[in-house]
């Protein structure tokens, strides 16, 4: 008798528990359906992979395994994946999925013109100026503030792009100039003069340094000697002796104009013919001085010009090549 009563009690308790579980399940299904109805259609069509498992969902899963009811901060929703099957995911209740997106502010042409003018005047508009500008343009202060922030960001980006482009252009120009200088140095010989004056290069400077050409002086030696002899014959006494003195100073008399003394003997007369001076003794002394040290003067002038050319080439793109060429040329000239 008592055993049957116990069995009946157990059976009643099990039926009561089953009814309670079914009621809870029905209530949960209603909540799920309500949540599904409130979600937008685009959200329901998204696959399950679009939602990553966060720490909150893991906490919700742990709490679900521990207790039959979900905590207050969890939200269970149903999502239809790409295959059409419905899956259940758990998200925090703080995630507001129903909130509409913020609309993008569209400015009119007049508003943009006024905002741009104010930005050119002052990049930071605060306080009363911003309030007055927003009132005049029929905008809120937040819209004006956000527009100025975006405009400053755009200006910084543009400045960065401009500086980068400027650096690229300057580097390209420098490279082109260096290549042009290298090409000029390869096609043209570097400026310079030899150490000795007689085999000097052609040009205005060389002709000025040389003065009368050497063949002309040599050719005029015969005429100079004849004129000197005539002057010695006509001049009486000491004048004839004075007129014969310059050839002796210039050098020993040689056989004809091509001899060693031909150049020095013809030099006073050539100078006399050029400058038309009546004093042959003065011309003879000047010619003797010039003929005594032509190599030293030529060497000093050529050395100075070589130094100037080296300084000029030191600022060019082919500096190493010019320095080596100058050194080799100087060594060869010193050996000669």
From Swiss-Prot:
Which UniProt keywords are present, listed alphabetically? Developmental protein, DNA-binding, Homeobox, Nucleus, Transcription, Transcription regulation
Cellular component terms, GO, for this chain's entry?
nucleus
Output the Gene3D superfamilies linked to this UniProt entry: Homeodomain-like
Which PROSITE patterns does the entry mention?
Answer: HOMEOBOX_1, HOMEOBOX_2
Top-rank taxon of the source lineage equals Eukaryota
Biased composition annotated in UniProt, kind: Low complexity: 236-250
Specify where it is mainly localized. nucleus
A Gene Ontology MF term for this entry?
Answer: chromatin DNA binding
Q: Where in the cell is it found?
A: Nucleus
Regions of compositional bias (Basic and acidic residues) in chain numbering? 1-34, 325-336
**What does this gene product do?**
Transcription factor that may function in dorsoventral specification of the forebrain. Required for axon guidance and major tract formation in the developing forebrain. May contribute to the differentiation of the neuroretina, pigmented epithelium and optic stalk.
What the entry lists under PANTHER family is as follows:
HOMEOBOX PROTEIN EMX-RELATED, VENTRAL ANTERIOR HOMEOBOX 1
Tell me which family the UniProt entry assigns to this protein.
Answer: Belongs to the EMX homeobox family.
What protein name does the entry list? Ventral anterior homeobox 1
Name its species.
Answer: Rattus norvegicus (Rat)
């Amino acid at each position: 008798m008592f055993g049957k009563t116990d069995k009946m009690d157990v059976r009643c308790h099990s039926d009561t528990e089953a009814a309670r579980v079914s009621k809870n399940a029905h209530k949960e299904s209603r909540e799920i359906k309500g949540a599904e109805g409130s979600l937008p259609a685009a959200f329901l069509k998204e696959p399950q992979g679009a939602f990553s498992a966060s720490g909150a969902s893991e906490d919700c899963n742990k709490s679900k395994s521990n207790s039959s009811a979900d905590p207050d901060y969890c939200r269970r929703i149903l999502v239809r994946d790409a295959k059409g099957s419905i899956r259940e995911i758990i998200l925090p209740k703080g995630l507001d999925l129903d909130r509409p997106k913020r609309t993008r502010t569209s400015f009119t042409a007049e508003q943009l013109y006024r905002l741009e003018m104010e930005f050119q005047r002052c990049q930071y508009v605060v306080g009363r100026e911003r309030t007055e500008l927003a009132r005049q343009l029929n905008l809120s202060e937040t819209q004006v503030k956000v527009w100025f922030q975006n405009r400053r960001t755009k200006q910084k980006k543009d400045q960065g792009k401009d500086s980068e482009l400027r650096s690229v252009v300057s580097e390209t120009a420098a490279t082109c100039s260096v290549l042009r200088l290298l090409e000029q140095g390869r096609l043209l010989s570097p400026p310079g003069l030899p150490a000795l004056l007689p085999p000097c290069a052609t040009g205005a400077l060389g002709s000025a340094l040389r003065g009368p050409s050497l063949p002309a002086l040599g050719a005029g030696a015969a005429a100079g000697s004849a004129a000197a002899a005539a002057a010695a014959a006509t001049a009486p006494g000491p004048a004839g002796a004075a007129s014969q003195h310059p050839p002796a100073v210039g050098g020993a008399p040689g056989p004809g104009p091509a001899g060693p003394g031909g150049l020095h003997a013809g030099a006073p007369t050539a100078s006399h013919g050029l400058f038309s001076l009546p004093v042959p003794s003065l011309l003879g002394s000047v010619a003797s001085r010039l003929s005594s040290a032509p190599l030293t003067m030529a060497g000093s002038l050529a050395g100075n010009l070589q130094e100037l050319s080296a300084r000029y080439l030191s600022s060019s793109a082919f500096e190493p090549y010019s320095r080596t060429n100058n050194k080799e040329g100087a060594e060869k000239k010193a050996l000669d």
